[in-house]
Amino acid sequence: MEERTFSRPAASATVLVGTQFGDEGKGKLVDYLSDQYDIVVRYQGGANAGHTICFDGKTVVLHLIPSGIFNKDCICVIGNGVVIDPNALMEEIQKVEELGYDVKGRLFISHNAHLIMPYHKRLDSLSESCLSGDQKIGTTGRGIGPSYEDKFARHGIRVVDLLNPKVLEEKLRDNIEAKNKLICKVYEKEEIDVDAIIGEYEAFDKVIDPYVTNTQLYLNRQIKAGKTVLLEGAQGCLLDVDHGTYPFVTSSNPTSGGACTGSGVAPNHIGKVIGVCKAYMTRVGNGDFPTELEDETGEKLGEIGHEFGATTGRKRRCGWLDLVALRYSLTISGVTELALTKLDVLDTFEEIKVCTSYMLDGKEIFDFPTEHQTLCRVQPVYKSLKGWMASNANAKSFAEMHPNAQAYVNFLEEATGVPVTFISVGPGRDETVFK
């Protein structure tokens, strides 16, 4: 009998994930790479994530629209895995158009994406306010979690419902009746006006209709036609609801697996996974952070790196790079190459530390424990590296970078087994080195 093998389709999609707690600089990378891809897709999260892009002397923060929108030849898609606040989306579309970029014909929104309603935001704030101290998650209050709750409870409202006023009104009345019972009887707060919300959301139909399509079919047909796709994640792997530092996580899957379920692109189309890693670490909100620096060094990292949340403006907690956590993220997302960002923030440090393992109850461990009860007890073990005390902003190649900066990058590669291909040495598009 003739031996046969199954052929594998040519992979034409790339996934880009954050490998830490979010805020790794994914926006700059997507903006830089978007001219190499025909389509950029946002596949999870909502307006709780902010991607910052610096170009032409401007700094722009996007929360929902993919960062590729500033490449005029790029098509942008908001996938089915995203939860959409229509008000925030309309404001963002207006912002992009005011900057001189066309959105119509270049932005498509999944008809299956779920909507964030006013009652989701209300419940988000009420739920968080009832928690105390270490129990607080540090939610952005944007209604993300409650919207995903409704999605998985199978009574969420989707974009497609905006296109049918009768269906929309029926679903809103049913949902708000249930939410008002919770708001009034459990939280003892004033109920929500259902008629006001119905009027507001019916008006979104005319505005959003030109952008709505079946993006699952659209993306797969475009891939079949030879188009290339970049799938852009929000937040980071360590905030993944299944694989992150639960319960201090987001409500979706920022890992590479979420790219397929959140876009409808099949796994066999994924050719590579780019992991974005900051040269140090930050975290917004509560949750375990083994390498956090609550001293002058942490303050210095925050000041130089301008570490304030793009969505909430909250001050980020700062610390040294954690290789234990990073290796875990690379494993669960199958990262094939690393993009190292904000290396320039370390330019004025004589000594740079990197966590290589943890001490737990007197034993050295190398695997990342995701459960809070264990992670809160680990102590980082550091390796010290020499700083470079110089700027690499003018370097046009890896060889032109300071030798100690090169050594830092090489150490990161050796410690993770993953090549670093992109190095950000400043916020601008041109302050980038490829290795």
UniProtKB/Swiss-Prot annotation:
Pathway: Purine metabolism; AMP biosynthesis via de novo pathway; AMP from IMP: step 1/2. Keywords: Cytoplasm, GTP-binding, Ligase, Magnesium, Metal-binding, Nucleotide-binding, Purine biosynthesis. GO terms for biological process: 'de novo' AMP biosynthetic process; IMP metabolic process. Mg(2+) binds at D23, G50. Gene3D superfamilies: Adenylosuccinate Synthetase, subunit A, domain 1, Adenylosuccinate Synthetase, subunit A, domain 2, Adenylosuccinate Synthetase, subunit A, domain 3. It is an enzyme of class 6 (ligase). The keyword Metal-binding applies. It catalyses: IMP + L-aspartate + GTP = N(6)-(1,2-dicarboxyethyl)-AMP + GDP + phosphate + 2 H(+). Homodimer. HAMAP family: Adenylosucc_synth (MF_00011). NCBIfam families: PRK01117.1, purA. Plays an important role in the de novo pathway of purine nucleotide biosynthesis. Catalyzes the first committed step in the biosynthesis of AMP from IMP. This is Adenylosuccinate synthetase. It comes from Chlorobaculum parvum (strain DSM 263 / NCIMB 8327).
